[in-house]
């Protein structure tokens, strides 16, 4: 499909099912996965994106970094955080052939400079602060 090559596009799996029960289950399954991603960053059961199941986070901030899968990205993220004296309380990485997905939980406030530097890492596809 030509859609596969578009940047900033996440394709969702097709779940075949034509019965009323299957349609109801699909109607609950897909929104639940989207809500989980929005609220936690988790990508469990993703078909075309690295799968991460994340713990519930309390008293910290969660940073989401999606990047091209190449060496040195995690080291670069960690150097930026260390330079700003920010402690990492949890870090979760999963990759596929082309995409790297890292979630970094930090234990203190951050400033706009940190966010700017993380967004500017070469190879970054998307970065966001979850909370």
Say what each PLM segment does.
Residues 1-56, 101, 131:
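Rossmann-like dinucleotide-binding domain for NAD(H)/NADP(H)
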Residues 44-131:
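A conserved regulatory-domain signal marking ACT and ACT-like small-molecule sensing domains
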